[in-house]
Design a protein with these regions (language model features):
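Domain-level signature for soluble enzymes in the chorismate/prephenate branch of the shikimate pathway
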Residues: 1-193
Length: 193
């Protein structure tokens, strides 16, 4: 999402293992810009991130919609028949359910992140493991892409919010499509009825 939103700009991405860690990093460094998944066609609203955003002092400065496409990637010279585990984020595993059903030899192993799964396989030289991740992550970590487009729903999108500290939020030029959007948070008393 960051590469798509800031297309053509020279950016440095900083990896955070969890969304709470992302919000913590943003609260410690006002010069950072965050990209936070907020909803997905299949998984729905990511309520944890709504709450993290509400509790932060960050401002929404833009959004990016991204079609989710997964690949099956493994170490070079590995074939799909040699694989025993498919490592990925639980939602990505869910998004590739039909593919995984066609390959019952692949034990699903939940990890914290799709790209992190690819990184772990590459760095630890994990034979027999495959990552379900994006094509960019597979290429970045030198994995061989065995199959592309393994996601069940080809119309699966995730909407990301671009968030920043108010100190720098005004410096970020909003995209045309973001100019007419508002986000409102309100609470109601929790009573019967």
């Amino acid at each position: 999402a960051a590469r798509e939103y800031f297309k053509g700009e020279d950016i440095e991405t900083v990896e955070c293992d969890t969304f709470p860690l992302l919000f913590e990093a943003l609260s410690c460094d006002a010069s950072m810009i965050g990209i936070v998944a907020i909803e997905n066609t299949i998984a729905g609203s990511l309520l944890q991130n709504h709450e993290l955003l509400r509790l932060s002092n960050l401002q929404i400065v833009g959004e990016q919609k991204l079609r989710i496409s997964h690949v099956l990637a493994a170490l070079p010279d590995q074939t799909i028949d040699q694989l025993t585990e498919a490592d990925s984020h639980p939602i990505a595993l869910m998004q590739c359910e039909q593919f995984l059903r066609r390959h019952p030899n692949l034990k699903m192993t939940e990890k914290f992140d799709t790209a992190g799964s690819a990184k772990e396989i590459a760095e630890q030289n994990l034979l027999g493991h495959a990552a379900i991740c994006g094509e960019y992550a597979a290429t970045l970590y030198g994995l061989n892409i065995l199959e592309k487009g393994i996601e069940t729903n080809k119309r699966n999108f995730t909407r990301f919010l671009i968030v920043a500290d108010p100190v720098i939020a005004h410096e970020l030029k909003p995209r045309e499509e973001s100019l007419n959007k508002s986000s409102i948070v309100f609470t109601l008393p929790h009573t019967q009825g």
